[in-house]
Amino acid sequence: MYEKLTRKQANRLEQQTLRVSVFTIVGLAIAGIGFGLYIGSEAVMLDGFYALTSLLGSGLYLLAAKVVERPADRHFQYGYAHIEPLVNSFNNLILLIVCLYALFNGLEGLRTGGNPVDVGNVVLYSVLSAAVCAAVWIYERRVAARSDSQLIRNDAREWMISMGFSIVTVLGFAMVWVLPEPYRSWWARYADSGVVALMALLL
């Protein structure tokens, strides 16, 4: 059992946690987009772009955490609690746009003959990304349980989705190492586009 926090303590912990989330996302976004461009992998770049949408979401959650603690005023006589569902709705809309764009790119890649990439590099990046996402997810779940913060729960859910994306990417590309020929060569060419399309549907 966690010691019960005052509202002020919970809000301070909430903001500190969201700052950690934002800084971590910045690192993942830069790494994903930069490394994805370097090795030519759309799946890794999608991981980076998804991190960018998460950055926007976490930034909005942090802003909401600061706004919600304000007392009611003459413009908002019932306080600012309504800000949280608005932020959630906006984040879901951004995620939908990213998924549709990724699905289009993935299907286009499949249609045009795939995109062969270095499987080892993709798997290495995705394993590291999954480990980072898992660490932040576990951390935020504990903070959410202690502070009873819906904003942290929502942000933790996004980290869980990111972790799932990385795990599916690892499994999808690792199949190249276990499939017999001629399936290995075929999947090596289509794995990148196929994983992008699959993740767009799952997200």
Question: What does each model-identified segment do?
Answer:
Residues 2-20, 39, 43, 47-203:
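Alpha-helical transmembrane segments and adjacent TM-loop junctions that form the membrane-embedded core
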Residues 19-32:
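The first (N-terminal) embedded transmembrane alpha-helix
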Residues 35-36:
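Hydrophobic alpha-helical transmembrane segments
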